[in-house]
């Protein structure tokens, strides 16, 4: 077990060892724990409250979306865009939380971190409403190759997940997923998740990265990641 592994490491090194959960539901508590350990309770509480506000906002909005209106999202990673993370994994939990549906649930999960490779035929079979691609994927060539027959591609409903300083959904599944909730909710259901995404990104970067993000920098990050008009 993880607890046993932590005990072993602590005994071998003589250094106090803790395990921090990566689940979004536990992340605020994790920051509060770190604040207690490091003596930075005030800063940790500010971060934890942002996370709590984010998760509560998403849960409230998702509850308003009827099952019949939940968008099917293909979340493709890797250079081919065909490595798909399983529903319920920490790599894909942002999709579930904002009220969408993971379009492809691999029958056999062979690699939770990097995703399970599926065929393009499987993608066509589910006909996703929206396609999300990680950085380094086939975003630039999607309209020219085998993906071009998909309705989501033809209608411009494909996007590249922002990735600075880390991916906002996975790779690795870091605290940036908190910002990913705001981004994906606003992208998929803008009438429910109605706010200025640039302002949210600026607040997040100030709190979590101690960086004053300019409007121009935010626009650059979101250039492949916002609704096309």
Where are these regions (language model features)?
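Proline-aspartate-enriched helix->loop->beta-strand connector
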Residues: 1, 15, 119-136
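Short beta-strand and adjacent tight-turn residues that come in two discontinuous sequence segments
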Residues: 19-20, 105, 133
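Short, structured coil segments at secondary-structure junctions
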Residues: 12-13, 98-99, 153-154
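A ligand-binding cleft/hinge motif common to bilobed small-molecule-binding domains
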Residues: 1-11, 134-149
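Alpha-helical, coiled-coil/dimerization segments enriched in small aliphatic residues
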Residues: 84-114
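Alpha-helical scaffolding within the catalytic cores
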Residues: 4, 60, 90, 115-122, ...
């Amino acid at each position: 077990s993880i607890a046993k592994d932590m005990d072993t490491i602590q005994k071998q090194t003589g250094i106090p060892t803790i395990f921090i959960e990566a689940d979004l539901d536990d992340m605020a508590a994790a920051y509060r724990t770190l604040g207690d350990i490091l003596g930075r309770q005030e800063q940790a509480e500010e971060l934890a409250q942002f996370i709590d506000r984010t998760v509560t906002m998403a849960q409230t909005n998702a509850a308003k979306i009827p099952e019949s209106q939940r968008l099917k999202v293909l979340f493709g990673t890797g250079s081919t865009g065909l490595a798909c993370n399983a529903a319920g994994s920490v790599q894909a939990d942002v999709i579930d939380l904002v009220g969408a549906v993971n379009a492809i649930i691999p029958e056999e999960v062979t690699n939770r971190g990097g995703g399970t490779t599926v065929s393009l035929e499987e993608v066509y079979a589910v006909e996703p409403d929206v396609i999300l691609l990680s950085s380094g994927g086939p975003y630039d060539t999607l309209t020219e190759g085998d993906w071009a027959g998909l309705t989501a591609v033809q209608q411009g409903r494909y996007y590249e997940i922002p990735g600075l300083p880390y991916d906002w959904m996975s790779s690795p599944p870091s605290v940036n997923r908190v910002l990913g909730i705001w981004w994906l909710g606003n992208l998929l259901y803008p009438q429910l998740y109605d706010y200025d995404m640039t302002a949210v990104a600026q607040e997040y970067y100030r709190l979590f990265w101690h960086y004053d993000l300019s409007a121009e920098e935010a626009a650059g990050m979101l250039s492949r990641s916002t609704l096309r008009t």
